[in-house]
C-alpha cells in the first residue's frame, strides 16, 4: 500500500487521508506518479509532532524528500487541508484514541 498510496484514486473524502507508518524513523520521500489528486503531505516524528508539510502536485514524478531523518509517519490529505485546519510544523497530532503511536497500536 505504501508504494501505491493514492495512485489511480479519483477522490478522497474531505476530512480523510492516508497515514503511512514506518518501522523506524528515517528520511523519506513521496512522489505523485499516477496520482491526479492535489495533495498535501505532513512528515511526522515518533512523538506525533509535525516536522514538515509540503504540497504535492498531480502527476509529478519528482519525489518530495523530507529534510529530517526523524520521520516515523507521513500523512497525505487533500491539498490545503493542513492550512485550513491550523496544522503547521510543531503541531502535535492525536486521534480519539490518543497519539498517533497509540492509535496505530490499537488498530
Regions found by a protein language model. Give the residues of each.
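Compact, glycine-rich, soluble single-domain proteins
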Residues: 1-107
Amino acid at each position: 500500500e505504501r508504494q501505491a498510496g493514492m495512485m489511480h484514486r479519483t477522490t478522497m473524502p474531505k476530512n480523510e487521508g492516508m497515514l503511512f507508518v514506518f518501522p523506524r524513523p528515517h528520511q523519506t520521500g513521496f512522489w505523485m506518479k499516477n496520482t491526479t489528486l492535489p495533495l498535501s503531505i505532513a512528515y511526522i516524528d515518533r512523538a506525533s509532532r509535525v516536522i514538515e508539510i509540503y504540497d504535492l502536485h498531480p502527476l509529478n514524478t519528482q519525489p518530495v524528500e523530507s529534510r529530517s531523518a526523524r520521520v516515523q509517519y507521513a500523512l497525505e490529505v487533500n491539498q490545503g487541508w493542513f492550512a485550513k485546519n491550523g496544522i503547521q510544523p510543531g503541531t502535535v497530532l492525536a486521534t480519539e484514541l490518543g497519539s498517533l503511536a497509540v492509535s496505530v497500536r490499537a488498530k
